[in-house]
């Protein structure tokens, strides 16, 4: 029995501090800062294939930047933070143009935001606000249209810094 417990603890410890697989394509997302799991010099890099291999979730919603209801698909932000072994919920989200948003993830965790890579079943390109867009379910929670929530919906997301 003691051996079984010791093996279980060893397995759990190795999962918490596990090495992430390296991306095989160009990374589109980097999670850095206070993280435990990395695959690139203290950071966790993800290519599109890695994000698509994670459990996918869909948010169907309208928002100020589109005229009609859109179907967005991608992994939950909470799953990505867990995979990287984030040790804090204070985040800085950085877009391709270096636009930054400071966010306390606990403030929006209940809404289960996703990092959308697909808009209406099409992979989002940079010209379409891709490759990643933090998406909130505004139709289900109209209060998300108010400040500061709509500021958190950063598009062309390239990195998350855990502070």
Regions found by a protein language model. Give the residues of each.
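N-terminal intrinsically disordered, low-complexity segments enriched in P/E/S/T
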Residues: 18-163
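Hydrophobic h-region of N-terminal signal peptides that target proteins for export
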Residues: 8-17
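Positively charged n-region of N-terminal signal peptides that target proteins for export
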Residues: 1-4
């Amino acid at each position: 029995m003691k051996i079984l417990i010791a093996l279980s603890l060893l397995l759990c410890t190795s999962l918490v501090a596990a090495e992430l697989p390296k991306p095989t394509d160009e990374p589109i997302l980097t999670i850095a800062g206070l993280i435990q799991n990395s695959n690139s010099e203290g950071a966790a890099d993800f290519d599109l294939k890695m994000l698509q291999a994670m459990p996918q979730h869909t948010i169907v919603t309208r928002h100020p930047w589109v005229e009609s209801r859109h179907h967005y698909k991608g992994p939950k932000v909470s799953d990505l933070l867990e995979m990287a072994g984030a040790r804090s919920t204070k985040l800085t989200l950085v877009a391709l143009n270096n636009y930054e948003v400071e966010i306390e993830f606990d403030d929006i965790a209940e809404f289960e935001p996703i990092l959308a890579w697909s808009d209406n079943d099409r992979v989002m390109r940079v010209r379409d606000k891709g490759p990643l867009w933090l998406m909130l379910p505004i139709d289900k929670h109209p209060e998300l249209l108010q400040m500061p929530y709509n500021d958190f919906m950063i598009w062309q997301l390239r990195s998350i810094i855990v502070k």
